[in-house]
C-alpha cells in the first residue's frame, strides 16, 4: 500500500481517521531522554528505581561521542521532535541504512529552519504552528518518513531533554523517501497545514457547516436530579461535533462539572461515555479560553470535534 507525503499530512488533522482501527502491525510510541535507571522486570512484575528523575540526557547507546536517541526498523514516520533546551550540538538523521546522514544541523535550528546540511543554505521555515514554542519547549511537527530504517543521533552540546514521537506501519506500507529537497517541495502543503493548525477549532466548526452535515440546534433546561435526552437517532450516522452555548455570560466550570454526558451506541445497554461536561470538553476549574484541534473553549461556548460513527445513538444529559 503506497502512502504519499500528503497522506501523512492528512493524518495529522483528519478526525475521521481516528474512528478507523489501525492495521495489524501498526503501532505508535515515543523515544525520549528518560532516566534509564528506571526499569521494569516482567518476570517479577516489579519496578526498580521508578522514581529516578534524571530525564534530561537518557539515550539508547553511545557511538563514539554521539548518543543514539532514536533507532527503529521501518516502515515508519517520525511525527514530532521536541526538546526543552535545544542547543548548538548537531542532530543527525540517517534513513534507509545509508551511511551518510539525511539531515545534519544544529539541534536548535531544527526548530527554526528547513532541514539543511553543508551543501544547502539555511532557509527559515516560518511555520509558527508546526514549530511552536510552548512553555519554552521547542516543537517540530513535520513528518519524516522512512521505509527500512531510521536512526537519530545527537552530538555533544546538543542540549537537554528530547521526545521523538513515531508510528511504525505494517511491512506492506510503502512511504515516500525523505530528503532535504522534500521539505522544500512540499512547503506549500506544509504552509496549508500550518494555517489549519492556526485555525484549530474555528476550521472544524466551519467544516461542520458543509452540505452533507446536519446541524441540530437544541435548547435544554436540566434541573438537579433530572435526566433528559440530548439527542437520539436510530439511523446510521457520524457525530462530528458537539457544541455547548451557555445562556449566561460565562460558561462556568462549576456548572459544567454538575452536568453529566452519557452516550449509548448501537443499542448497547452499557453506556460508552459517562463523564461530566467539564471533562468531556476538557475544562478544569482554572482553565482559560483555548483552542486545540479536537476541543476548544471560549467565554460562553465549549466545543468537541471527536468523530463518532455509529448505527444508532442515544445521548443523555443529567
Regions found by a protein language model. Name each.
Residues 1-89, 159-255:
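Solvent-exposed, flexible loop/coil segments flanking beta-strands in beta-rich domains
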Residues 65, 104-144, 273-307:
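A cross-kingdom feature marking solvent-exposed beta-strand/loop segments within repeated
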Residues 90-98, 254, 258-265:
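Short, surface-exposed beta-strand/strand-loop-strand elements in extracellular ectodomains
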Residues 141-143, 248-255, 262, 305-309:
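Juxtamembrane membrane-water interface segments of multi-pass membrane proteins
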Residues 154-157:
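Short beta-strand-plus-loop segments that form exposed binding edges in beta-rich domains
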Amino acid at each position: 500500500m503506497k502512502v504519499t507525503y500528503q497522506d501523512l499530512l492528512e493524518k495529522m488533522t483528519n478526525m475521521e481517521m481516528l474512528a478507523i482501527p489501525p492495521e495489524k502491525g501498526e503501532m505508535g510510541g515515543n523515544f525520549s531522554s528518560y532516566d534509564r535507571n528506571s526499569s521494569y522486570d516482567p518476570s517479577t512484575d516489579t519496578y526498580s528505581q521508578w522514581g529516578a528523575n534524571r530525564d534530561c540526557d537518557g539515550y539508547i547507546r553511545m557511538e563514539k561521542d554521539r548518543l543514539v536517541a532514536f533507532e527503529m526498523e521501518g516502515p515508519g514516520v517520525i511525527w514530532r521532535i521536541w526538546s526543552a533546551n535545544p542547543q548548538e550540538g548537531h542532530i543527525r538523521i540517517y534513513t534507509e541504512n545509508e551511511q551518510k546522514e539525511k539531515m545534519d544541523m544544529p539541534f536548535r535550528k531544527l526548530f527554526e529552519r528547513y532541514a539543511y546540511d553543508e551543501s544547502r543554505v539555511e532557509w527559515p521555515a516560518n511555520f509558527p504552528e508546526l514549530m511552536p514554542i510552548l512553555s519554552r519547549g521547542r516543537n517540530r511537527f513535520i513528518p519524516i518518513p522512512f521505509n527500512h530504517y531510521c536512526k537519530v543521533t545527537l552530538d555533544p552540546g546538543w542540549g537537554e531533554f528530547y521526545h521523538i514521537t513515531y508510528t511504525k506501519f505494517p511491512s506492506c506500507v510503502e512511504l515516500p523517501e525523505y530528503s532535504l529537497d522534500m521539505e522544500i517541495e512540499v512547503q506549500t502543503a506544509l504552509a496549508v497545514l500550518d494555517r489549519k493548525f492556526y485555525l484549530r477549532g474555528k476550521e472544524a466548526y466551519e467544516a461542520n457547516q458543509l452540505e452533507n452535515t446536519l446541524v441540530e440546534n437544541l435548547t435544554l433546561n436540566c434541573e438537579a436530579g433530572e435526566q433528559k435526552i440530548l439527542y437520539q437517532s436510530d439511523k446510521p450516522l457520524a457525530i462530528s461535533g458537539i457544541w455547548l452555548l451557555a445562556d449566561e455570560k460565562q460558561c462556568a466550570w462549576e456548572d459544567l462539572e454538575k452536568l453529566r454526558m452519557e452516550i449509548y451506541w448501537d443499542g448497547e445497554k452499557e453506556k460508552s461515555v459517562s463523564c461530566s461536561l467539564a471533562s468531556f470538553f476538557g475544562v478544569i476549574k482554572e482553565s482559560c479560553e483555548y483552542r486545540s484541534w479536537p476541543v476548544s473553549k471560549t467565554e460562553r461556548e465549549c466545543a468537541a470535534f471527536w468523530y463518532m460513527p455509529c448505527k444508532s445513538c442515544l445521548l443523555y444529559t443529567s
